[in-house]
Amino acid sequence: MNQIVLNIIIAFLWVLFQDEDHFKFSTFFSGYLIGLIVIYILHRFFSDDFYVRKIWVAIKFLGVYLYQLITSSISTINYILFKTKDMNPGLLSYETRLTSDWAITFLTILIIITPGSTVIRISQDSKKFFIHSIDVSEKEKDSLLRSIKHYEDLILEVSR
Protein backbone atom coordinates (compact mmCIF):
# COMPACT_ATOMS: atom_id res chain seq x y z
CA MET A 1 0.00 0.00 0.00
CA ASN A 2 2.84 2.39 0.78
CA GLN A 3 4.33 1.79 -2.65
CA ILE A 4 1.11 2.84 -4.40
CA VAL A 5 0.89 6.04 -2.36
CA LEU A 6 4.56 6.77 -3.05
CA ASN A 7 4.03 6.18 -6.76
CA ILE A 8 1.07 8.59 -6.85
CA ILE A 9 3.11 11.21 -4.96
CA ILE A 10 5.94 10.83 -7.48
CA ALA A 11 3.43 11.25 -10.32
CA PHE A 12 1.99 14.44 -8.78
CA LEU A 13 5.48 15.82 -8.18
CA TRP A 14 6.28 15.07 -11.82
CA VAL A 15 3.21 17.07 -12.88
CA LEU A 16 4.25 19.98 -10.64
CA PHE A 17 7.82 19.98 -11.93
CA GLN A 18 6.66 20.12 -15.55
CA ASP A 19 5.48 23.70 -15.01
CA GLU A 20 2.46 23.38 -17.28
CA ASP A 21 -0.47 25.79 -17.19
CA HIS A 22 -3.03 23.07 -16.55
CA PHE A 23 -3.18 19.46 -15.47
CA LYS A 24 -2.63 16.91 -18.24
CA PHE A 25 -3.37 13.27 -17.70
CA SER A 26 -0.56 12.31 -20.07
CA THR A 27 1.95 14.13 -17.85
CA PHE A 28 0.54 12.41 -14.76
CA PHE A 29 0.69 9.04 -16.51
CA SER A 30 4.31 9.57 -17.57
CA GLY A 31 5.14 10.56 -13.98
CA TYR A 32 3.38 7.45 -12.77
CA LEU A 33 5.45 5.29 -15.13
CA ILE A 34 8.64 6.99 -13.97
CA GLY A 35 7.59 6.38 -10.36
CA LEU A 36 6.88 2.76 -11.25
CA ILE A 37 10.41 2.36 -12.60
CA VAL A 38 11.95 4.07 -9.56
CA ILE A 39 9.95 1.95 -7.12
CA TYR A 40 10.80 -1.22 -9.05
CA ILE A 41 14.51 -0.40 -8.80
CA LEU A 42 14.22 0.41 -5.08
CA HIS A 43 11.57 -2.14 -4.04
CA ARG A 44 14.10 -4.40 -2.36
CA PHE A 45 14.38 -1.73 0.36
CA PHE A 46 10.65 -2.01 1.12
CA SER A 47 9.35 -4.75 3.37
CA ASP A 48 6.71 -5.76 0.82
CA ASP A 49 6.97 -7.22 -2.67
CA PHE A 50 6.65 -4.96 -5.69
CA TYR A 51 3.01 -3.87 -5.65
CA VAL A 52 2.36 -4.41 -9.38
CA ARG A 53 2.79 -8.13 -8.73
CA LYS A 54 -0.05 -8.02 -6.20
CA ILE A 55 -2.23 -6.16 -8.67
CA TRP A 56 -1.51 -8.84 -11.28
CA VAL A 57 -2.38 -11.58 -8.77
CA ALA A 58 -5.64 -9.79 -7.91
CA ILE A 59 -6.56 -9.57 -11.62
CA LYS A 60 -5.70 -13.25 -12.06
CA PHE A 61 -7.80 -14.05 -8.99
CA LEU A 62 -10.76 -12.15 -10.42
CA GLY A 63 -10.45 -14.02 -13.73
CA VAL A 64 -10.29 -17.41 -12.02
CA TYR A 65 -13.26 -16.56 -9.83
CA LEU A 66 -15.39 -15.36 -12.75
CA TYR A 67 -14.55 -18.54 -14.67
CA GLN A 68 -15.48 -20.70 -11.67
CA LEU A 69 -18.68 -18.71 -11.13
CA ILE A 70 -19.81 -19.17 -14.74
CA THR A 71 -18.97 -22.87 -14.90
CA SER A 72 -20.60 -23.64 -11.54
CA SER A 73 -23.70 -21.65 -12.55
CA ILE A 74 -24.00 -23.69 -15.74
CA SER A 75 -23.48 -26.89 -13.75
CA THR A 76 -26.17 -25.90 -11.23
CA ILE A 77 -28.62 -25.01 -14.00
CA ASN A 78 -27.84 -28.37 -15.62
CA TYR A 79 -28.64 -30.18 -12.35
CA ILE A 80 -31.87 -28.26 -11.84
CA LEU A 81 -33.17 -28.74 -15.37
CA PHE A 82 -31.94 -32.19 -16.33
CA LYS A 83 -30.49 -34.14 -13.41
CA THR A 84 -32.85 -33.60 -10.49
CA LYS A 85 -33.07 -37.37 -9.94
CA ASP A 86 -29.27 -37.71 -9.99
CA MET A 87 -28.64 -35.07 -7.33
CA ASN A 88 -26.86 -36.26 -4.23
CA PRO A 89 -26.84 -33.30 -1.80
CA GLY A 90 -24.76 -33.58 1.32
CA LEU A 91 -22.11 -32.17 3.61
CA LEU A 92 -18.38 -32.24 3.24
CA SER A 93 -15.53 -30.72 5.18
CA TYR A 94 -12.51 -28.76 4.07
CA GLU A 95 -9.40 -28.10 6.15
CA THR A 96 -7.92 -24.67 5.42
CA ARG A 97 -4.38 -23.33 5.67
CA LEU A 98 -5.55 -19.73 6.04
CA THR A 99 -4.83 -18.07 9.37
CA SER A 100 -6.07 -14.49 9.23
CA ASP A 101 -9.70 -13.67 9.91
CA TRP A 102 -10.13 -11.60 6.74
CA ALA A 103 -8.77 -14.42 4.55
CA ILE A 104 -11.08 -16.98 6.15
CA THR A 105 -14.03 -14.62 5.74
CA PHE A 106 -13.11 -13.98 2.11
CA LEU A 107 -12.86 -17.70 1.37
CA THR A 108 -16.23 -18.24 3.06
CA ILE A 109 -17.80 -15.55 0.89
CA LEU A 110 -16.30 -17.08 -2.25
CA ILE A 111 -17.71 -20.50 -1.35
CA ILE A 112 -21.14 -19.05 -0.57
CA ILE A 113 -21.29 -17.03 -3.79
CA THR A 114 -20.40 -20.08 -5.86
CA PRO A 115 -23.70 -21.70 -6.95
CA GLY A 116 -24.43 -25.13 -5.55
CA SER A 117 -22.43 -24.78 -2.34
CA THR A 118 -22.65 -22.93 0.93
CA VAL A 119 -20.71 -22.88 4.18
CA ILE A 120 -22.82 -24.26 7.00
CA ARG A 121 -20.30 -23.89 9.81
CA ILE A 122 -16.70 -23.02 10.56
CA SER A 123 -14.95 -24.87 13.39
CA GLN A 124 -13.99 -23.07 16.61
CA ASP A 125 -10.32 -22.91 15.62
CA SER A 126 -11.29 -21.56 12.15
CA LYS A 127 -9.41 -24.37 10.43
CA LYS A 128 -12.27 -26.49 9.13
CA PHE A 129 -15.21 -25.55 6.92
CA PHE A 130 -18.38 -27.62 6.82
CA ILE A 131 -19.90 -27.14 3.38
CA HIS A 132 -23.26 -28.16 1.95
CA SER A 133 -23.09 -29.06 -1.72
CA ILE A 134 -25.79 -29.79 -4.27
CA ASP A 135 -23.91 -32.95 -5.27
CA VAL A 136 -21.37 -34.83 -3.18
CA SER A 137 -20.66 -37.61 -5.64
CA GLU A 138 -16.95 -38.37 -5.83
CA LYS A 139 -16.38 -36.45 -9.07
CA GLU A 140 -18.31 -33.33 -8.01
CA LYS A 141 -16.86 -33.40 -4.50
CA ASP A 142 -13.31 -33.51 -5.86
CA SER A 143 -14.10 -30.70 -8.29
CA LEU A 144 -15.52 -28.50 -5.52
CA LEU A 145 -12.60 -29.18 -3.17
CA ARG A 146 -10.11 -28.44 -5.98
CA SER A 147 -11.76 -25.10 -6.72
CA ILE A 148 -11.80 -24.19 -3.01
CA LYS A 149 -8.10 -25.09 -2.76
CA HIS A 150 -7.43 -22.95 -5.82
CA TYR A 151 -9.26 -20.01 -4.17
CA GLU A 152 -7.22 -20.60 -1.03
CA ASP A 153 -3.93 -20.62 -2.96
CA LEU A 154 -4.85 -17.35 -4.67
CA ILE A 155 -5.83 -15.74 -1.36
CA LEU A 156 -2.49 -16.82 0.11
CA GLU A 157 -0.70 -15.38 -2.92
CA VAL A 158 -2.53 -12.06 -2.64
CA SER A 159 -1.96 -11.78 1.11
CA ARG A 160 1.81 -12.31 0.96
UniProtKB/Swiss-Prot annotation:
<dbReference type="GO" id="GO:0005886">
    <property type="term" value="C:plasma membrane"/>
</dbReference>
<keyword id="KW-0472">Membrane</keyword>
<protein>
    <recommendedName>
        <fullName>Putative antiporter subunit mnhE2</fullName>
    </recommendedName>
</protein>
<dbReference type="InterPro" id="IPR002758">
    <property type="entry name" value="Cation_antiport_E"/>
</dbReference>
<feature type="transmembrane region" description="Helical">
    <location>
        <begin position="100"/>
        <end position="120"/>
    </location>
</feature>
<keyword id="KW-0406">Ion transport</keyword>
<feature type="transmembrane region" description="Helical">
    <location>
        <begin position="22"/>
        <end position="42"/>
    </location>
</feature>
<keyword id="KW-0050">Antiport</keyword>
<keyword id="KW-1003">Cell membrane</keyword>
<feature type="transmembrane region" description="Helical">
    <location>
        <begin position="55"/>
        <end position="75"/>
    </location>
</feature>
<keyword id="KW-0813">Transport</keyword>
<keyword id="KW-1133">Transmembrane helix</keyword>
<comment type="similarity">
    <text>Belongs to the CPA3 antiporters (TC 2.A.63) subunit E family.</text>
</comment>
<dbReference type="Pfam" id="PF01899">
    <property type="entry name" value="MNHE"/>
</dbReference>
<keyword id="KW-0812">Transmembrane</keyword>
<comment type="subunit">
    <text>May form a heterooligomeric complex that consists of seven subunits: mnhA2, mnhB2, mnhC2, mnhD2, mnhE2, mnhF2 and mnhG2.</text>
</comment>
<dbReference type="GO" id="GO:0015297">
    <property type="term" value="F:antiporter activity"/>
</dbReference>
<dbReference type="GO" id="GO:0008324">
    <property type="term" value="F:monoatomic cation transmembrane transporter activity"/>
</dbReference>
